[in-house]
């Protein structure tokens, strides 16, 4: 996918990995970057606008845990303004296994609901033009950090959902791929709670191992966007971008 002159919606585009990725996207010259985030950050939006004045950067407040009907209303506002949207990035995520329901609501259900809502505008069965979805999942969807099983399971669920979306592209016209960052130096990983406090030092222990910067992750994220490979399972770890071959252990046969 060519980012230049495209219209992109980025859910959680002001977070740790999100903000650096928004910067890299803006540098590539889309026509519009629409940032949806729970917390407004006027300074970050102003920075993005100044980074490339030719790009129209717009912000809307958005909590991914709202009902699908509310998301559809927001998307209608965006589609009425832009007419077309080429790419949806679902990037909302929290890492706190003390918040079980919210972890699942943000990391998994929010991704499903936002995707479901945009199908009203993209699904070719409804006369839509199709589109592309990039879901930010995690390497913990491959193999869990067992001290944070709720977070890991929520990301595995998001990965499975994304893989299914890709398989449905011939029906819906909507393609999808997953972005799976390794341990990245963000506020998210500097301090977080393990499930039932099974390992109070889990964040500290993780950061004793090699990590990557948000900029490294963002630069590889843009490469994955440009590759635009339906069904791709991208691993963004230690400054590298690698396509993962998923091992099939069972097939529904349908």
Swiss-Prot record:
Annotated NAD(+) binding sites: 10-33
List, alphabetically, the GO terms of the cellular component aspect.
Answer: cytoplasm
The identity of this protein, by name, is Alcohol dehydrogenase
SUPFAM superfamilies xref list: NAD(P)-binding Rossmann-fold domains
The terms under GO molecular function for this entry are: alcohol dehydrogenase (NAD+) activity
Example of a GO biological process term: alcohol metabolic process
Which keywords does the record carry? NAD, Oxidoreductase
Source organism, top-level taxon? Eukaryota
EC number(s) from the headed UniProt entry: 1.1.1.1
According to the UniProt record, what class of enzyme is this?
Answer: oxidoreductase
**PROSITE patterns recorded:** ADH_SHORT (PS00061)
- Quaternary structure note: Homodimer.
| Annotated Pfam families | adh_short
- Report the source organism: Drosophila planitibia (Fruit fly)
Q: Which residues form the active site?
A: 151 (proton acceptor)
Reactions catalysed: a primary alcohol + NAD(+) = an aldehyde + NADH + H(+); a secondary alcohol + NAD(+) = a ketone + NADH + H(+)
Family, similarity comment: Belongs to the short-chain dehydrogenases/reductases (SDR) family.
At which positions is substrate bound? 138
């Amino acid at each position: 996918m060519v980012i230049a002159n495209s219209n992109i919606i980025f859910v959680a585009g002001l977070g740790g990995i999100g903000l650096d990725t928004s910067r890299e996207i803006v540098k590539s010259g889309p026509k519009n970057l629409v940032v949806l985030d729970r917390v407004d950050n006027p300074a970050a939006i102003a920075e993005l606008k100044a980074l490339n004045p030719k790009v129209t950067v717009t912000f809307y407040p958005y909590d991914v845990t709202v009902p699908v009907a509310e998301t559809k209303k927001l998307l209608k506002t965006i589609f009425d303004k832009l007419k077309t949207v080429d790419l949806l990035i679902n990037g909302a995520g929290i890492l706190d296994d003390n918040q079980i329901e919210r972890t699942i609501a943000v990391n998994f259900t929010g991704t499903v609901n936002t995707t479901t809502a945009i199908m009203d505008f993209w699904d070719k069965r409804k006369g839509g033009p199709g589109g592309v979805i990039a879901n930010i999942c995690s390497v913990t969807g491959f193999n869990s950090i067992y001290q944070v099983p709720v977070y890991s399971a929520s990301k595995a669920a998001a990965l499975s959902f994304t893989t299914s979306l890709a398989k449905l592209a011939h029906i819906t016209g909507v393609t999808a791929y997953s972005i799976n960052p390794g341990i990245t130096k963000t506020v998210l990983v500097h301090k977080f709670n393990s499930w039932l406090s099974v390992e109070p030092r889990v964040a500290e222990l993780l950061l004793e191992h090699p990590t990557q910067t948000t900029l490294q992750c963002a630069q590889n994220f843009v490469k994955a966007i440009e590759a635009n490979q339906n069904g791709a399972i991208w691993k963004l770890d230690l400054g590298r971008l690698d396509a993962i071959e998923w091992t099939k252990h069972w097939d529904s046969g349908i």
